[in-house]
Amino acid sequence: REFNCTGAAATINNYLIKSPFAVLDFNAAAKEEVDFIKSSDSVYNANLALMKSANLPANFTKKEQQRLLFKSYAMFPMYMSYHPYLKKMDSYTPTALYTNKLKEVAIIDGNCLEYAEYGDFIMNAVFCQAFQGGDRSKELMAFMDANIKDAKVKSYITNAYAYDVVSSSGLDGKDELIAYFHKNVSDPKLVDKFDKVCKQWEGLKAGCISPSFTATDINGKQVSLSSLKGKYVYIDVWATWCGPCRGELPYMTKLEEQYAGKDIHFVGLSCDSNKSAWEKRIQKGDMKGIQLHLGTKSDFMQKYLINGIPRFILLDCEGKIIKADAPRPSEPNITKLFDELLKK
């Protein structure tokens, strides 16, 4: 239904709500640098023309022009990862043509954080330049210390990254990142929120007793975690609808075959809300290990702070946590970890 805003800011609001802003398509990253830059510039110029045609107040257009810069070039930083992906390249190093343009548009100015578009844009710009295939936290901290002098921008990126990493994967190996957070983030609300999630993960450190579960196998039998003591337990929290979960299944099968007869229980814990979907998948007969249905409303998932799947958990023979966020079956270091444990 067509509608119009009224009142003192009607012109601005109608412009923001109704304007068909230009955006750059993901596939544009397949273009070579010179053409990608031209396409990005064209999007920005089209949005500027749209703004100028709207007869907006002068005090608004100055800010809007800056907002449109970040909105129009939103995909520009991701070119470094999207381009080699779309072109199926083993490696890609951007030329000075691209990097100079990135420096031109990626303004480091904390005052720009008033625009939602800037926060996402500058974070992606920093991530794409910082991450080089090693330890991401170390790479990011080193890059920001060398290149980001604006305290507001540094705090914004540090908070967003550190909170996401700790809330999703815990405290293991995060001491340096946590210290970096407290050095660069001073907003009491952000610090309190971060400290709370750190405290939640304290109970999931290595050596802590694992939260328990009782789940149902395909025959309706109840199986508890305590019944699995005596062997290491490698748990896969998954669901039939989860693409990344399904992607790990072939690797899990290989692991189970490689360590058959060893002191490791391989446990699949389904969090499917639709139990029949899980039953149909298990009845295919190609999934090994101990397959159980846990469901969505589980204390186990809440206590392990699981907010995304798949999630892998590794426990020792006494039911104590080794890793609350263990490597996936597809990661090479999982076999090294198993081998080290089995030598003990």
Residue ranges of predicted features:
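Oxidative protein folding and maturation machinery
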Residues: 1-219, 223
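Conserved redox-active cysteine motifs that mediate thiol-disulfide chemistry
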Residues: 229-230, 236-254
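Structural microenvironment flanking redox-active thiols in thiol-disulfide oxidoreductases
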Residues: 247-285, 296-302
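Thiol/disulfide oxidoreductase modules built on the thioredoxin-like
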Residues: 285-287, 294-340
